[in-house]
Amino acid sequence: MSTPPSLPATGVPAPHLPRGAAAPALPACLALAGPTASGKTAGALALARALAPHRPVEIVSVDSALVYRGMDIGTAKPTAAEQAAVPHHLIDIRDPLQPYSAAEFVADAQRLVREIQARGALPLLVGGTMLYFKALWDGIDDMPPADAAVRARLEAQAAAEGWPALHAELARVDPQTAARLAPGDSQRIQRALEVWHVSGRPLSSFHTRSRAAGEAAGAARMSMPLFSLEPQDRAWLHGRIAQRFDAMLDEGFVEEVRRLRARGDLHPDLPSMRCVGYRQAWEALYEEARTGRLPLAQLRERGIAATRQLAKRQVTWLRSMPWRHAIACDAPDATQRWVAAALHALGVPA
């Protein structure tokens, strides 16, 4: 993993302004992104403490897993004490049976930012769902809604032929989308083929932007600077991921998924149950029901491997955002550097 762009100790360098030019407007809100286990929650809370004498902070979660109630351990959800110390939004807003789309996130986040600003607080958007961040800046086209009949047909086809066969089908109708998806990425393959069958358009065609949309995205980036926590050493992040997964197992993650399975109305193809860790735990519990033995070592191995892959995808997304301010999350003073950079961007003395 290459070293992310470095920041000086004070954070974002002050812009060079022509003589007589007005200083740029201070950002309306801040965003903090990063791969899983990079320290985003700790960083967000540290900034809230540093800003407390100047301005209250409210956190808007940018995480597609934290929206689900009853999924606390496997998502590393902020604790009740952390949520009590700093207001958090877009956490526990859906039952695991319910979907939550990027379009819904954008609408909710934009509304919350306005409400938080009206209260005189700083909106701080924090998370690792890069699609949500991208949708905030670039906007999203009006893609067709989910079609239950088409989804059922695709699931039946996948059961008969396997998801790699559907990935090959996607490559014929939408090679651009297929190129960025793994043959086993059932959720995204299904959605891409669903869009094709419902609209007659490839999913990739919905991501093109007009010039006006591009200008609007540029304005959005100016009003909401993106800071990212990125590791210089991949092994450091892998170690953190393993430690966190072990801690989740110790805290009762398997029992959490067991309770979800016991509801009887959830299944492994739901977006909630496809979340990293939950899918692997669901499969392990299925194996336990079949054989009477829980393959805990296999669950740990597969869960950590899946989380590593998620982190890799998150870093790839971040590197496609050249306007971000990258901070090495594995540096000993990473939290201090992030706080100093954020305070500088806000015009607050460190």
From Swiss-Prot:
Binding site for substrate: T36, A37, S38, G39, K40, T41
Region (Interaction with substrate tRNA): 63-66, 187-191, 274-279
Cofactors demanded by this protein: Mg(2+)
Enzyme nomenclature, EC number: 2.5.1.75
Name of this chain's protein: tRNA dimethylallyltransferase
Catalytic activity as recorded in UniProt: adenosine(37) in tRNA + dimethylallyl diphosphate = N(6)-dimethylallyladenosine(37) in tRNA + diphosphate
Keyword field contains tRNA processing: yes
Domain of life the protein comes from: Bacteria
Residues at which ATP binds: G34, P35, T36, A37, S38, G39, K40, T41
Family statement: Belongs to the IPP transferase family.
Matching InterPro entries: Dimethylallyltransferase, IPT, P-loop_NTPase
GO annotation, biological process: tRNA modification
Annotated function: Catalyzes the transfer of a dimethylallyl group onto the adenine at position 37 in tRNAs that read codons beginning with uridine, leading to the formation of N6-(dimethylallyl)adenosine (i(6)A).
Top-tier EC class: transferase
Keyword ATP-binding on entry: yes
Keywords: ATP-binding, Magnesium, Nucleotide-binding, Transferase, tRNA processing
Site positions (Interaction with substrate tRNA): T129, R151
Pfam families associated with the record: IPPT (PF01715)
